[in-house]
Amino acid sequence: MKLNLYVLTPKRIIWDCEVKEIILSTNSGQIGVLPNHAPINTAVDMGPLRIRLLNDQWLTAVLWSGFARIVNNEIIILGNDAELGSDIDPNEAQQALEIAEANLSKAEGTKELVEAKLALRRARIRIEAVNWIPPSN
């Protein structure tokens, strides 16, 4: 059995393909979705999206929040923004993490602190996507 996965952002279609399984970050934690999953509508949190292809290869994407609808073996994810793990430059991601950590340490005031924490969270998620090791089959 398979799932039809669509990942859409206002700028582009990130994913439109049949898959075996996904692991999705929601506001209440990560959920795994296999064929014949119970229907669900859920908010999507910032975090990784793990995609298991029909050939059992795993890919990673990063979602920057949104909404997901799962029904009748179809998953539609409407995201504010997203990027495929393969599109993330590991060196650039590491540099962004270091900058975010430095900015957090020198943040002053509530607004700067909130912005620095958000930038750090985004940087860590991107690093996680780049460094993720898929489970062995």
Swiss-Prot record:
It is a peripheral membrane protein. SUPFAM superfamilies: Epsilon subunit of F1F0-ATP synthase N-terminal domain (SSF51344). Pfam families: ATP-synt_DE, ATP-synt_DE_N. The keyword NADP does not apply. It is found in: Plastid, Chloroplast thylakoid membrane. The keyword Lyase does not apply. It comes from the Eukaryota. Keywords: ATP synthesis, CF(1), Chloroplast, Hydrogen ion transport, Ion transport, Membrane, Plastid, Thylakoid, Transport. One of its GO terms (molecular function) is proton-transporting ATP synthase activity, rotational mechanism. Gene3D superfamilies: 6.10.140.480, F0F1 ATP synthase delta/epsilon subunit, N-terminal. GO terms for cellular component: chloroplast thylakoid membrane; proton-transporting ATP synthase complex. Produces ATP from ADP in the presence of a proton gradient across the membrane. Belongs to the ATPase epsilon chain family. F-type ATPases have 2 components, CF(1) - the catalytic core - and CF(0) - the membrane proton channel. CF(1) has five subunits: alpha(3), beta(3), gamma(1), delta(1), epsilon(1). CF(0) has three main subunits: a, b and c. NCBIfam families: ATP_synt_epsi (TIGR01216). This is ATP synthase epsilon chain, chloroplastic.
